[in-house]
Amino acid sequence: SEDQQWANYRINETPSKGVMMWGKMTNQYNQLSMGYNSDSNIERMGYDAHGFTGKRVMGYAESHDEERLMYKNLTYGQSSNPSHNIKNLKVALSRMSAVGAVSLLVPGPKMIWQLGDLGWEKSIFTCANGTVNTDNDATNGDCKLSTKPQPQWVDNWLGDDNRNKIYNDWAKMIELKTTEPI
């Protein structure tokens, strides 16, 4: 494919000249984090699933253009099991450590979007007044580019055991990935 040609271009030169490709996996990772089996195959997070010789896929579960995993966990997450209701903040946050385990440890570079490692749960369509307004809502426009509330600083998210656990779990996985051959 054309992507393979770009990624593998002059791969044996030092430095190699190949192009890094984006590996959007938002829907698949969100299905996993929400507790659903459908459309949850994360195989394409790795470069080898694309047929690339080098680690040329910048895989990610979240970005500036995609809805936050935590927002969808709390809004649409599996809630049929009362002892593991993903719409519960503590349960939803616990699932983010698992997202790190099955994304960060895949060989190749990864992108972590702002505060995903602390379980940011506000929609990307959150307005300055705290409401959520997407381009699909009855009111014209959306708030995707609005200034977002910043509770992580005033509420000391690193002092919150549930959020700090995600941060520390992800840090351990990144350290493992960078110090051990995976």
Q: What are the functions of these language-model segments?
A:
Residues 68-71:
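Short, solvent-exposed loop/turn elements at domain surfaces
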Residues 76:
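Gly/Pro-rich active-site loop or hairpin
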